[in-house]
Amino acid sequence: MQIIWSKNAQITFEAVVVYLEDNFGVNIAKKFIAKTNSSIQVIASFPNLYKAISLKQNVRKATISKICSFYYDVNEDTIVILYFWDNRQEPIDF
């Protein structure tokens, strides 16, 4: 399946990377990027691997680390990465 990054996903991903670089160093940020890319490749092959959120069955939440997840929308031919989320925040409702 084709992976598409939404504008929000690009912005929130970059914000997480900058936060990690500033607070934990470049190596931690690089590990986060690698883990994210790996998760996205797995999702491309197995789009329904992660749990669907309650109200929208086509939107799923993939956990990258205990502090960060990303939400993605599974469509017929594409997967849209919607945004990255700091798990320390209150969950969002769709």
Which residues make up each language-model segment?
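Basic, Lys/Arg-enriched alpha-helical interface segments
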Residues: 2-55
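Charged, low-complexity, helix/coiled-coil-prone segments
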Residues: 7, 57-60, 88-94
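Basic/aromatic recognition patch in beta-strand/loop cores that engages polyanionic ligands
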Residues: 48-78
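Enriched for short, Lys/Arg-rich terminal
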Residues: 68-69, 73-94
